[in-house]
Structures are given as C-alpha cells and as structure tokens.
Amino acid sequence: METRKVKETKDGADVKRFRERLKDKKKIVVKIGSSSLQHSETGDLDYTKLDVLVRELCDMRNRGKDVVLVTSGAIAVGKKAVNIKDIKHEEEDNPIAVKQACAAVGQARLMMTYQKIFAEYNQVAAQILMTKNTIVDNLNRYNAHNTFSELFKLGVIPIVNENDTVATYEIEIGDNDTLSAIVAALVDADLLILLSDIDGLYTDDPRQNKNAQFIEVVEELTDELMDMGKASTGSSVGTGGMNTKLIAAKIATSSNIDMIIANSKDIKVLHRILDGKNIGTLFVGNKETYFDLPEFVANMHNN
C-alpha cells in the first residue's frame, strides 16, 4: 500500500510560526470524546482524567481565556447506569427511544460529575444542549450566540453536548467532532482542540501502512485529504472517526479558526498546546468568504 500525498507544511520555520501564534488565542473550544472519558476495561467514567481535564480548563480561564467544553459521554454513562450493553439488541423495536432514555439518564449524571469537579476549582459551569435547529434557525442561532456571550462575560465555562434526548435524524448533528466545530464558529472562537484516541492526522492509516507519515501542519484542506477520512471509523464507544474530524476541520478553518487534533491519553497536552509546543496536527484557519455556517449545517446529511 502506497502512502498518499497531501498538501502539508514541512518547513520548520513555518511550523514554529503557526505554533507560536497559539499562545495568543483568546477563545478556545475543547472537545473530548466518549472513549477518552471512560476506562476501557469497565466502561465506567475515568475520574482521574475528568479531574485533569477540568483542572486544565480552569487554568485556561485563570489565564484570561474564554473556554467552551464540548463533551461526549451522556449515552454511554446512561447505558452503564441502567445496565444496557448494546442498545441495538436490547430493544430492537425502538432503539432510538432506548438511546434517548439513556441520554436523559446519562446527561444528568455527567453534568453532576462535571459540576462537582469544577466546584472544587471554584469555577462555575453551565450546560448547553444543542440540535441542528439551534444553528439553522436564525432566531435560535442568535439566542444561542447571545447566551454564550453572556456566559463568557460572567466567567462561566459552558459545557455543550448534543440534545440526544430529543434529537432525531432530521435535527441531529450526529457527532461531537462536528458539533464542536459548529460551536467554535458560532461563538467566534480562534482555536478548536479535538482530544481523541489518536495522535493526529497521518498520510494513511498507520495501523495498516508502516510507511504512513504523521502530518504536523495542514495549510489547505484539499479534496484528496478530505477523501482520506471517508473510510475511517470511530471507536465502539464514540460516533466519530477521522472523517468527522476532517469535516470539523473544514468548518473550523473555513471560519478562520485554527484546529488541532491531539491524543487525549495525556490531558495535560492542553496547556502545552497553548504554550506553542508541537503537539498533534494543526489545521490552519483560512477564512473562506463563500462559507455559510447555517447552510452547511442544514445540508450536512445531504453531502
């Protein structure tokens, strides 16, 4: 299998320049996936990781930055709470209802956990649940933007998830990689960090191709690069693979937002990224005048 070629930045000076400007980012959206929040052996929440994540986010606030957390995990937490292992087989007649019931249980438990940990660091957090209609509808989008803006003024960290309890195919965004990019564009963020179970973007699947090369910086999202993610799949816990991360990169970079994919194995990479360290894959923001967020979101399932 040959390694595919994609446009990337290789010059060391360019890499350093792009990384250095991360130090000046003022409004940051951080997304963490379901698999990053749980112990793989049991499916229970990893409280150590949660504590480190909250501490890192609070430290960002203490550095004077506005912060948003987009978190997965509600359905997984709910399934664990009501002892359901596989929604598809547990209730084949109406799996959507089972999924939404698990989300209702899990979202409450997840937020309770976050609130307790944030309180230990004297930080106030807020919950925001979104669907596609939050962005597509002009009034809903306006109100959501105002809510985020007021929370930032109050020094609050918004915790965002999709409203899985009511979302159906017609109004769902579908994964939190995409949701986090939509949120970043909505709040006019200047940096989006996707924490996942991968180090970043490679020229090919490193598990299948030993010659696959790690990509440090991507300056342009070419069609060939976007096609690379379409065959990827996510973990058994989450809903996103590399394809959703590249879609997120498309939304973010088109909105002039830098985006980084980094491994959540060590949550402390967050402050290292903001210190300009060369961690993960950096997608460079490049405003596209033709890009319209509500239109893109409205047509997502049609692409």
Region spans (language model):
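C-terminal catalytic "cap/lid" subdomain
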Residues: E2-V124, I128-N303
